[in-house]
Structure formats: structure tokens, C-alpha cells
From Swiss-Prot:
It comes from the Bacteria. GO terms for molecular function: argininosuccinate synthase activity; ATP binding. Belongs to the argininosuccinate synthase family. Type 1 subfamily. L-citrulline binds at Y90, S95, N126, R130, S181, S190, E266, Y278. The lineage of its organism: Bacteria, Pseudomonadati, Pseudomonadota, Alphaproteobacteria, Rhodobacterales. The keyword Cytoplasm applies. This is Argininosuccinate synthase. Its EC number is 6.3.4.5. L-aspartate binds at T122, N126, D127. One of its GO terms (cellular component) is cytoplasm.
Length: 408
């Protein structure tokens, strides 16, 4: 394959992606286009523009975009309709952001006439897979460059030397090894590596950046009411909000009460186990509330089927198959299940916990007259249960009879 002439780089403005930018220019002699996404990571992004210009990028080749609303509306919310948890615990905060970034890389490549895209994911992690599967799903002819799999800059010392040789500014706090690496967006903050690599040691307090220590959270609980329409949150405490605004507000509430901390050893798609510290305050509240509204609006058959496919759906997202036909097929089933998932849930926030305490809906299937312990005025005839039990017991009785005969 011929060397690329123009490359769109996923660019944060940090030291590593600045080194990648310069490496692409020197190694491939290509024109570089940068894309920086505002996913709600909480960083000022204009310095990324200034740094790109300083490194020789034409102003027209610098793309900085606020994609927070698209991220929550088109990626986070569809995932939350499924109550997706990878390995029963992980809310997929990093996994769900990668398809959007890769999608924009491919779209910008088409807009600018670039023939390749590049990312800064290492050769050991899942992100390289997620970026590249998305790129190839959207443009089979695109070339993907993964510098960490190609170059010889295999140590922090070599990276610093390359930066100094190429006049790339290095902040004083970037010269040494960071105690851990951080990835953040509006859904979560992920911390991995170095001081966290020994799973037998508790993570130090300074790792947590988005949530207060639950033991130091307010001594008074706080209640929040979340309104849903067809499975998506649309209002908080009666106030209609955009998707990104809802998640931002829930992050503030959850962080204040120490909600959403997770210390997890997970199975990476590439074959190894890794330890991560995840903070997902708003997402944890949202998941709890969504489950709460489903409890009264979703039929048991549909709900149990939906629960059974959730692990596979979550695994597809974790492994990078957002744009696969099987994920889209499952999404259609999940979205169908949400047609009546509308109503309001009250969640109690207290010292690390988010717990549903009330829920109501015009679409509710809950019938108090059927379930009451008091007189039900004929709504339910308890004698009907006898035939129901006899029919369900029939096969068990036949099995027991057979077993007794065989043993005899």
C-alpha cells in the first residue's frame, strides 16, 4: 500500500498526540489534519488549536468540535436503553466514546480528501480495536495508522527526546512518568496503569477526581426525579433538558454524593486482564432510574428477553462493534421494548448509593387491585392458581415418576 498523502489525526493537544503529529510529518512526509472532540472531558480545547498551529498545521486543517449532545443522544442514551453493563459491572464509558471519534475521523477524511486516519491508542489496549473497526466499517478503503504499533519510541525517555529534538513544548509535569493515565468524557472518568497495576492494593484517594469519598459525602440524603420518554431521560425535577445537560446535572449530583465508583479487573478484548478505576456518577443514577421505570412499564416476557441479550450487546460495544449488523439488530429489538418506557422515577442519593424509592407512569402495568393483600373485589380469583400449578408441575411429576421407575 502506498504511503498516505493526508492523514486525519485524533488529536488531544497533549504531549503524546503532539509527538504523533510530528512523527507523522517526519515519518510519512504527509499533510496532517487534526480533529479534537469535546466529549465533556472538562478541558479547555483552544490550546489544542494553538499547539497544532505551532506544529505547522494549517488553520483550515484544524477541527475542534463540541460533540457532547451527539455523544449522549446518539451513543450513550441508546446504550442505556439496554441497561448495558460489561461483565455485569462496567458502564462502558470509554468504549461508547470511541465510535463517535472514529466516525468523525472518517467523515473529516472524506471532507478534506485525506486517505488515512491515525489514533494514539497503544498496541496493548482495546481502543486500537474500537477505532479501527469503526473506521473500516464506515470506509473499507481507509488506511489506519497506529504509531504505537510502528515506531521505536518505546519509553518515556525516548518520547521526551523526540519531543525535544522536534521543538515540541513539554510541560514540567509531563517530563516524568505520570502516576496513572486518565481518560474522561461526559459519561465517566477512567484511571489505569502504574500505581493501579497491582490489583492487591487499594487505589490511593488521589486517583478519584470526579466523586467525593462516600464516607465524606453529605450526611443528608438528596432526592432527584428523572422523567423518561420511550426509554430516554428528558427532564430532571420537572425541568426539561437536553441529553448532555441531563448527564451533566446528574454528574454533579452523583459526584457530590460519592455515587458511581468502581474498582474493576476486566477482561480486555485483546486477551489480557487489566485493572481500572471508573467514576460514572451520572450514568449510575441514570441506570438506576431507567431500571426503575422499566419495572412498572415493561412486560415480564419482554423484560426477561431484553435482560438475556444485554450481556452480548454490552460485549459488542466493549469490543468495538458499534457499527456491526448484530449490534444494530439488537438495538432495534431494544428500542422496540422502550415504546412504553415513559414516566418518572425518584432516586435517593446517599453516601455512594443511588436507589430508586418511587416510580409512576401513565403506561404502568402495575395493578394495585390485583396485587393487594386486602380485599380485591374479585380482580383475581386465587382458585385459578391451582390449575396453573398443576399444568406447570406436570413435566416435573413425569420426570420424577420416570426416575423412580429407572432406579427401581
Amino acid at each position: 500500500m502506498s504511503a498516505p498523502k493526508k492523514v486525519v489525526l485524533a488529536y488531544s493537544g497533549g504531549l503524546d498526540t503532539s509527538i504523533i503529529l510530528k512523527w507523522l510529518q517526519t515519518e510519512y512526509g504527509c499533510e496532517v489534519v487534526t480533529f479534537t472532540a469535546d466529549l465533556g472531558q472538562g478541558e479547555e480545547l483552544e490550546p489544542a488549536r494553538e499547539k497544532a498551529v505551532m506544529l505547522g498545521i494549517k488553520p483550515d486543517n484544524i477541527f475542534i468540535e463540541d460533540v457532547r449532545e451527539e455523544f449522549v443522544r446518539d451513543f450513550v442514551f441508546p446504550m442505556f436503553r439496554a441497561n448495558a453493563l460489561y461483565e455485569g459491572l462496567y458502564l462502558l464509558g470509554t468504549s461508547i466514546a470511541r465510535p463517535l471519534i472514529a466516525k468523525r475521523l472518517v467523515e473529516i477524511a472524506a471532507m478534506t480528501g485525506a486517505d488515512a486516519v491515525a489514533h494514539g491508542a497503544t498496541g496493548k489496549g482495546n481502543d486500537q480495536v474500537r477505532f479501527e473497526l469503526t473506521a473500516y466499517a464506515l470506509d473499507p478503503a481507509i488506511k489506519v495508522i497506529a504509531p504505537w504499533r510502528e515506531w521505536d519510541l518505546t519509553s518515556r525517555t525516548r518520547l521526551i527526546e523526540f519531543a525535544e529534538q522536534n521543538q515540541i513544548p513539554i510541560a514540567k509535569n509531563k517530563r516524568g512518568e505520570a502516576p496513572f493515565s486518565v481518560d474522561a468524557n461526559l459519561l465517566h472518568t477512567s484511571s489505569e496503569g502504574r500505581v493501579l497495576e497491582n490489583p492487591g492494593e487499594e487505589a490511593p484517594d488521589y486517583v478519584y477526581q470526579r466523586t467525593v469519598d462516600p464516607e465524606k459525602a453529605p450526611d443528608t440524603p438528596e432526592f432527584v426525579e428523572i422523567t423518561f420518554e420511550k426509554g430516554d431521560a428528558v427532564a430532571i425535577n420537572g425541568e426539561a433538558m437536553s441529553p448532555a445537560t441531563i448527564l451533566t446535572r446528574l454528574n454533579e449530583l452523583g459526584g457530590k454524593h460519592g455515587v458511581g465508583r468502581l474498582d474493576l479487573v476486566e477482561n480486555r478484548f485483546v486477551g489480557m486482564k487489566s485493572r481500572g478505576i471508573y467514576e460514572t456518577p451520572g450514568g449510575t443514577i441514570l441506570l438506576e432510574a431507567h431500571r426503575g421505570i422499566e419495572q412498572i412499564t415493561l412486560d415480564s416476557g419482554a423484560g426477561h428477553l431484553k435482560d438475556s441479550i444485554m450481556p452480548r450487546y454490552a460485549e459488542l460495544i466493549y469490543n468495538g462493534f458499534w457499527y456491526s449488523p448484530e449490534r444494530e439488530m439488537l438495538q432495534a429489538l431494544i428500542d422496540k421494548s422502550q415504546e412504553h418506557v415513559s414516566g418518572t422515577v425518584r432516586v435517593k442519593l446517599y453516601k455512594g448509593f443511588a436507589r430508586t424509592v418511587a416510580r409512576w407512569s401513565d403506561h404502568s402495568l402495575y395493578s394495585e387491585k390485583h396485587v393487594t393483600f386486602e380485599e380485591d373485589a374479585g380482580a383475581y380469583d386465587q382458585k385459578d392458581a391451582a390449575g396453573f400449578i398443576r399444568l406447570n408441575a406436570l413435566r416435573l411429576k413425569l420426570i420424577a415418576t420416570r426416575n423412580a421407575r429407572v432406579k427401581g
